[in-house]
């Protein structure tokens, strides 16, 4: 079986490094990265990741908008999307689900919970 591909999207290089480190240390998944919603859309369409983990607050296009746009395109419509942010208020979480995300986690990310969430969406 080919290695699963995860698209990690965050404008923070530190957050990307941390998420990538968790994934690569504990799985055989291949990590792709993007630093904003526009790059995320381009990579999601060209690389066909198995799942997208995306920050909400980013320059150029935020995670809510990128999620909505991914749901509009045939090629990216069915890709599971997990939104990540420091804000955990109920209204903010609801806005994430209304944008089309499958799940929502808050920072700081717990490595074990993050891996379990990824594996649950990837059927492992």
Show the residue positions of the predicted features:
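Two-component/phosphorelay signaling modules centered on CheY-like receiver
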Residues: 13-32
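C-terminal output helix
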Residues: 109-118
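Receiver (REC) domain active-site loop signature in two-component systems and cognate sites
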Residues: 58
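Active-site beta3 strand of CheY-like receiver
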Residues: 47-53
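Short, conserved "switch-loop" micro-motifs in signal-transduction and mechanochemical regulators
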Residues: 87-88
């Amino acid at each position: 079986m080919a290695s699963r591909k995860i698209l990690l999207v965050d404008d923070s290089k530190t957050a990307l490094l941390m998420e990538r480190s968790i994934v690569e240390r504990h799985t055989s998944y291949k990590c792709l990265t993007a630093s904003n919603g526009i790059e995320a859309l381009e990579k999601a369409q060209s690389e066909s990741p198995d799942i997208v983990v995306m920050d909400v607050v980013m320059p150029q296009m935020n995670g809510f908008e990128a999620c909505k746009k991914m749901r509009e395109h045939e090629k990216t419509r069915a890709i599971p999307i997990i939104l990540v942010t420091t804000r955990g208020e109920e209204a903010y979480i609801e806005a994430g689900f209304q944008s089309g995300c499958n799940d929502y986690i808050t920072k700081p990310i717990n490595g074990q919970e993050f891996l379990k969430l990824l594996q649950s969406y990837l059927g492992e």
